[in-house]
Amino acid sequence: MSKPKIYIDGQAGTTGLQIVQRLSQRDDIDLLMLADEDRHNEQARKQMMDQADLIFLCLPDAAAVEAAGWIGPDKKVIDTSTAHRTKWTYGFSELDPALKEEIKTTARLANPGCHASGAISMIYPLAKAGLLKEDALLPIFSLTGYSGGGKKMIADYENAKEEEMNSPALYALGLGHKHIPEITKICGLKKAPVFIPIVDDYRQGMLTSLQLDQDSFVKPVSKDEILKVYQLAYQDAALVEVHTDSPAKLYSNTKAGKDSLEIFVNGNDDQFIISARFDNLGKGACGAALQNMNLMLGLDEKEGLIL
């Protein structure tokens, strides 16, 4: 049986480069590579797409939309941009068994955003269980390493001379972050969350927190009841761990270099903080993309992942 042929369009970007490095170490796929001088050659890119069984689009949104239009329906595509996240099959298999089966058969998959992965991992189980009020205010803070901003932000931080770049920075304060639409749609929310991302002076790792109180729920709940919702939701998830004992302090870079995600539940009788910790380049990008590729190709979903 021949190995599946994989082509990465956008192999020099942050996510594309990570995928290239990871797939180069595997012997169960055939990685198709363009010479550096051909990376912007449209004809050469199309020829690679024609040869491939599965194509990763690791491009800016507009370029991803254009490239997707070149690809025939018989080819499998994983788009890592935001362009198709509210339109194509959403690549978060742990959310629902039916979604996992859809991922296995789809030809068009949108890889989740990094911040969105954390937010959705926390909101979706509560919404699915019918516990959240339709008009609940959902404040979310999400702390990321600077690699989440791509090559330019990486260069800015690693060559920084300004002292202020040594401290955390809130951004997207206009409340229009590009991950909000997918969070809202995938979780079935009628009101968009109040989402504040924060970038800090470390390379990779992400910690996303959701703040809730009793007014967020349709009925009174306890911390243990909330914990049980997550335990049930992720009981068969190989890449999601729900902690029964949550520490009072969480570091955001603990999962750097890993492809799994952790859920923590903290709080008291009235207020709760749910946290998701993972690597923005792992379960938040490359790791999720490889997991989805494995599922779409009929392979073990954990193949080549770092847990």
Where are the language model's segments positioned?
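N-terminal Rossmann-like NAD(P) cofactor-binding subdomain of oxidoreductases
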Residues: 1-166, 171, 266-268
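Conserved active-site and cofactor/substrate-binding residues in soluble primary-metabolism enzymes
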Residues: 10, 14, 114-121, 174-181, ...
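Acidic-histidine catalytic/liganding microenvironments
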Residues: 26, 129, 190, 236-237
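Anionic group-transfer/hydrolysis microenvironments
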Residues: 81, 199, 279
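Anionic-ligand binding region
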Residues: 154-159, 166-199
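Short catalytic/ligand-gating loop segments at beta-alpha or beta-beta junctions
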Residues: 194-201, 242-248
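Conserved glycine-rich beta-strand-loop-beta hairpin in the small C-terminal domain of fold type I
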Residues: 204-208
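C-terminal active-site/capping subdomain that shapes the small-molecule cofactor and substrate pocket
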Residues: 211-307
